[in-house]
């Protein structure tokens, strides 16, 4: 079966509208999990206010800002940064794992029970979390160097969670296979990832202009919208990999 962008777009659109309720629920659940973890972090409010009130133009301005901090502020900033990274990874892994399990549950001819699917999710979660950490770290290094390497790494590593789920491979094998397949089919996978990135940028720009809306409400709308957008990308990539395995 030939793999085309139009075919994947049609299948993604069909699945999204067929399971829109479940996707919304998962997106909202991941957002509230994010909020719940944020409540437990309880950071130093002085550090949070400093981070929110300072606009860092580039890495050098951030480094200069950190150098001017005292030792206690540096310690609090490091702790806050680590906790925020963990919060983001847990939320992303929950969303990613839930959508993958949902697509798998719907796609399988022999239906699993909901209990079995939940069990699969919890077994899959630890390895997916570590994979997310590794791929996020690699992609961020790419973005620190230049924009293009970051985008390219985002594309070629995008299949790794789905390969990990299907093949039950080791983490590095999933990354290696993702790089090989994604590079080979970059003209098909690339548009999906770029659509997601552009969508994130447009949403961020649009929501930044709603200054009259309460900050917490805006955060909620932003997170749910971003999660739905990411879910669409996962559906697109999952469908690609299903067709790829059959071809």
Curated annotation (Swiss-Prot):
Localization per Swiss-Prot or TrEMBL = Cell membrane
The chain's coiled-coil residues are none
Asked if Iron-sulfur is a keyword of the record, the answer is no
Q: Which domain of life is it from?
A: Bacteria
InterPro entries according to UniProt = UPF0259 (IPR009627)
Q: In terms of one coarse class, where is the protein primarily found?
A: membrane
An example Gene Ontology CC term for this record: plasma membrane
Keyword entries, A-Z: Cell membrane, Membrane, Transmembrane, Transmembrane helix
User: According to the UniProt entry, where is the signal peptide?
Assistant: none
Q: In what way does this protein cross or attach to the membrane? A: Multi-pass membrane protein
Keyword Transmembrane helix listed? The answer is yes
Q: Which residues cross the membrane?
A: 20-40, 85-105, 114-134, 137-157, 188-208, 218-238
Q: Which family does it belong to?
A: Belongs to the UPF0259 family.
Record-given protein name: UPF0259 membrane protein BUAPTUC7_273
């Amino acid at each position: 079966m030939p793999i085309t962008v139009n075919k994947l777009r049609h299948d993604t659109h069909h699945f999204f509208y067929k399971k829109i309720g479940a996707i919304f629920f998962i997106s909202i659940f991941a957002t509230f999990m994010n909020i719940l973890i944020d409540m437990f972090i309880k950071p130093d409010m002085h550090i949070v206010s400093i981070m929110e009130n300072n606009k860092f133009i580039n890495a050098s301005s951030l480094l200069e800002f950190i150098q001017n901090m005292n030792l206690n502020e540096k310690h609090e900033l490091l702790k806050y940064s680590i906790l925020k990274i963990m919060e983001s990874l847990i939320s992303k892994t929950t969303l990613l794992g839930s959508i993958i399990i949902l697509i798998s549950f719907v796609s399988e001819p022999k239906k699993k029970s909901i209990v079995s699917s939940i069990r699969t999710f919890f077994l899959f979660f630890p390895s997916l979390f570590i994979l997310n950490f590794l791929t996020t770290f690699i992609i961020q290094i790419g973005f620190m160097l230049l924009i293009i390497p970051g985008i390219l790494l985002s594309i070629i590593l995008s299949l790794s969670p789905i390969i990990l789920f299907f093949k039950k491979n080791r983490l590095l094998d999933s990354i290696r296979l993702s790089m090989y397949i994604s590079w080979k089919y970059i003209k098909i996978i690339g548009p999906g990832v770029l659509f997601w990135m552009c969508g994130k940028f447009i949403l961020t720009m649009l929501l930044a202009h709603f200054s009259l809306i309460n900050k917490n409400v805006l955060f909620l709308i932003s997170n749910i919208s971003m999660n739905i957008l990411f879910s669409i990308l996962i559906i697109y990539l999952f469908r690609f990999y299903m067709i790829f395995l059959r071809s």
